[in-house]
């Protein structure tokens, strides 16, 4: 590496998250700091109370929706591809393909480029801008599904199973667990693309974010609240709720529902059984193993840093392929099984 600065002097792991000493800012800090670059709106990456937040306009809108208009003292919205500078450090945001407004932070200083991916995926998502690979010296990646066993099927195939079940069980409501930000809207759009034109019923926790997505140009079709209905009123209909609501008294309003859960973890049958899921749908907002490897091969980093997740498989891949790698083991980033109903809780999928 020919740069004038070492990677660990540009970005370093700290108890509060990744810190940039020359720029004096953090990326996705897990506690309030003076200056934060936020990659996306999920609660384990986007927290309230920072002095200043640099993020895409959509992420800032999501944070304001979830935490209130005073979630930060200073907002700095940056468009995809636009560069902001602080203390001579350039920060450019490029699409991550995770959820609406999600971005990778491209940090450049003294000839060294480091990319903080945040959470990302590579497959098409009708609700957000697709991932953009950026060649760099150091790529800092998540590893939620960082094992070869995690090879997810096509989304259309999984949604097709849901539509097929609706045809097989026309008298039973189909209750789908999907995270309030990103996954719920994606499942709705995938259902629309599969030809499902009937109203989709939603838990109250989804309503404000659904409206935000609609304002940002994502057409969700007819949406109705899943409240105030007779117990057998939703036979043959789709209702979407945060995953924990399926196991909560909220779900008792449905008579003998088919319970489904949209998550990459549904590839693990024991997890589906543990949750009592009748119809597991393998739909993830995180890169699976082939997508992770595709990304590394495209960005061609000299070093690979792994922030959180199952790093052992990726460390072994890097060793075999002659790429220097290290696991940062950052704390505070939850996997999608930890979601609970309510604002400000981990809810990425």
Task: Name the predicted role of every residue range.
Residues 34-41, 50-57, 69-78, 88-91, ...:
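Active-site regions of enzymes building and remodeling cell-envelope glycoconjugates
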Residues 96-107, 120, 124-125, 131, ...:
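Active-site-proximal loop/helix segment associated with metal-binding centers of metalloenzymes
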């Amino acid at each position: 590496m020919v740069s004038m600065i070492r990677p660990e002097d540009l970005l370093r792991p700290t108890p509060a998250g990744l810190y940039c000493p020359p720029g004096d800012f953090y990326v996705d800090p897990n506690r309030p700091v003076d200056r934060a670059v936020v990659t996306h709106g999920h609660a384990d990456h986007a927290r309230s109370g920072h002095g200043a937040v640099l993020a895409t306009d959509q992420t800032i809108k999501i944070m304001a929706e979830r935490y209130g208009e005073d979630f930060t003292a200073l907002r700095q919205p940056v468009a995809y591809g636009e560069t902001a500078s602080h203390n001579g450090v350039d920060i450019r945001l490029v699409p991550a393909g995770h959820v609406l407004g999600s971005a990778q932070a491209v940090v450049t200083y003294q000839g060294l480029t480091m990319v903080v991916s945040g959470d990302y995926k590579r497959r098409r998502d009708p609700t957000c801008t697709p991932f953009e690979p950026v060649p760099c010296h150091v790529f800092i990646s998540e590893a939620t599904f960082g094992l070869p066993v995690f090879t997810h099927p096509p989304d259309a195939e999984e949604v097709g199973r849901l539509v097929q079940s609706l045809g097989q069980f026309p008298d039973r409501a189909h209750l789908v667990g999907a995270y309030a930000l990103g996954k719920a809207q994606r499942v709705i759009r995938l259902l629309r693309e599969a030809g499902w034109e009937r109203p989709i019923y939603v838990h109250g926790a989804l309503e404000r974010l659904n409206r935000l997505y609609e304002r940002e140009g994502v057409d969700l079709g007819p949406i109705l609240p899943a409240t105030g209905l007779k117990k057998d009123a939703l036979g043959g209909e789709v209702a979407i709720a945060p995953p924990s609501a399926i196991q909560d008294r909220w779900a008792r309003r449905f008579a003998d529902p088919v319970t489904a859960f949209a998550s990459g973890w549904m590839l693990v049958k024991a997890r589906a059984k543990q949750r009592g899921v009748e119809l597991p749908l393998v739909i993830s907002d995180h890169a699976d193993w082939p997508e992770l490897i595709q990304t590394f091969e495209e960005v061609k980093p000299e070093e690979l840093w792994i922030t959180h997740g199952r790093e052992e498989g990726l460390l072994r891949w890097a060793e075999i392929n002659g790429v220097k790698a290290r696991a940062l083991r950052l704390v505070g980033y939850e996997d999608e099984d930890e979601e609970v109903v309510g604002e400000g809780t981990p809810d990425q999928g």
